[in-house]
Regions:
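Short, contiguous, well-ordered secondary-structure segments
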Residues: 1-5, 81-84
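The canonical Cys-X-X-Cys-His
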Residues: 19, 25-35, 83, 118, ...
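A structural feature that tracks compact, well-ordered secondary-structure segments
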Residues: 70-81, 85-91, 104-107, 119-124
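Flexible coil segments in periplasmic/lumen-exposed cytochrome c-class electron-transfer proteins
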Residues: 2-8, 12-14, 33-62, 93-155
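Glycine-centered flexibility sites
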Residues: 19, 27, 60, 74-76, ...
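Short, solvent-exposed loop/turn elements at domain surfaces
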Residues: 30, 38-40, 74-77
Length: 155
């Protein structure tokens, strides 16, 4: 058998506090908290998923998903190892890759203790029932406010 991706980190206050700190400095709320892009983050739904999508030319529109432990709309049905794979490998439980805007490459270098702390913190949050729109393919019209990401043209 293979070793688990997640260390056996008990959901103790120190691990949760470390995870909270890392989530804050990583700016996870920027893309995953409703209202953030309108300058009025809804802290009652902290990390509950964004209603604003990012349009990436040729790829479609992606929304920051719900990171709370809600079983229907968040990470509640994900295992700890699946959360770690998303954070450090950019891979969803069904094998699809996460949206290109997710900075998993940076998180790939987190220590096992740090990623375990993030998982413990996300598990400690109140569940927020909030289904985000999309994703929408390149030819699909989005049903939400969209921020366009336009790469510089090659010269």
């Amino acid at each position: 058998t293979t070793a688990p991706l997640v260390p056996a980190v008990a959901a103790d206050p120190a691990a949760i506090a470390r995870g909270k700190y890392l989530v804050a400095i990583a700016g996870c709320n920027d893309c995953h908290t409703p209202g953030y892009f309108f300058g009025k983050p809804d802290m009652a739904r902290f990390l509950g998923g964004s209603e604003v999508g990012f349009e990436i030319p040729g790829l479609g529109v992606f929304h920051g998903p719900n990171l709370t432990p809600d079983k229907a709309t968040g990470l509640g049905d994900w295992t700890d190892a699946e959360i770690v794979a998303a954070l450090q490998k950019g891979q969803r439980p069904d094998g699809r890759v996460l949206a290109p805007i997710m900075p998993w490459h940076a998180f790939a270098h987190l220590t096992k203790q740090d990623v375990g702390g993030i998982v413990a913190y996300l598990r400690s949050l109140p569940a927020v029932a909030h289904k985000v729109p999309g994703p929408f393919g390149p030819a699909e019209p989005p049903t939400s406010f969209v921020m366009k990401i336009v790469p510089p043209s090659a010269k």
